[in-house]
Amino acid sequence: MKVALVVTSGQPVVGREAQAIDNARAADAFWRNAAAEGKCSEPEWFWSSTAPAMTIVKGEAEDMQMLMATPEWQRLIMAAPLLIQNFSWELRMCGFDPLFSQFEAAVKEMGLA
């Protein structure tokens, strides 16, 4: 199953701007290295003048979970909320069918369709 790691972030914590930049660069390098090894997509960064920044990395669920369990990623993800306001992340299933087919099966099983 394909999944996407979706990371959102706001402005750096005042006084920690340089550390926030270092953390973002290290996170970008982490995912670019994994992409070069064929384990995921390259990170895509989305910027907005009025909304939080967003980064998306896609890959197979097993590969992404293994990458996210590494000590290197754990250090980066644990430090990020200390450096960046409104930091959050989530792992989402990709595509219409994976979730919809499960929902459809549950609806039929319950006799609601």
Regions found by a protein language model. Name each.
Residues 1-52, 59-69, 89-113:
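Short S/T/G/P-rich N-terminal loop/turn motif that feeds into the first structured element of a domain
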Residues 28, 72-79:
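A common structural junction motif
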Residues 76-94:
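Conserved short beta-strand edge segments in small beta-sheet-based binding/regulatory domains
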